[in-house]
Amino acid sequence: MPKKFRSKCTMTNLLDLIGDKWSLIVVRDLFLQRNTFSQLLNEGEENISTNILSDRLKKLKESGFIDFVNDRNDHKVKHYYLTDKGIDLNTVLYEMSMWSNKYLDRDFNKVSTYFFKVTQDLSRDLVISKSKSVYKEERDKLLDYHRNQQLYNVSF
């Protein structure tokens, strides 16, 4: 069923898809190579609940931002990954991080602090394009690993 939007405003439409408290956190964590339910649940510092995480994963998949592949050794485990549509949200995450760093007078976590340090002398476009290309390489490795094994497990 197609998503119903509140208006024809582009900003409102995007917020209807990912404007809740958790969706961009899940996208961020996928960029950080947290790709199983357990990793998404336990490795972030925000303490998302299992039902909220399940709901956001479902909504992000239905909206085409993410997909998953079953683990090659344990088909109960899903490895979530960003689609190209989801990867393009990297620009949004980057801009939100830069805004926070500029205007919020506070100490940030180690990941954010490290990110600001290593990117401070780099152009916005370079940081975004490199982040996207590195993620795509890792995603492709993940998919190749799990999909190739599934091909070999076919019985004749």
Describe the role of every protein-language-model region.
Residues M1-T10:
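A detector for short, charged/polar N-terminal pre-domain segments
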Residues C9-I52:
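N-terminal helix-turn-helix DNA-binding core of bacterial DNA-binding proteins
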Residues F5, K21-V27, F37, L122-S131, ...:
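Short histidine
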Residues G19, R72-M96:
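Basic, amphipathic "hinge/linker" alpha-helix immediately C-terminal to the N-terminal HTH DNA-binding motif
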Residues S38, K58, K78:
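Residues within the helices of the helix-turn-helix
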Residues E45-D71, H75:
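Canonical helix-turn-helix DNA-binding module
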Residues T91-F156:
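C-terminal regulatory/oligomerization modules of transcriptional regulators
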Residues I25, D29, F65-D67, E95:
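Solvent-exposed, amphipathic alpha-helical segments
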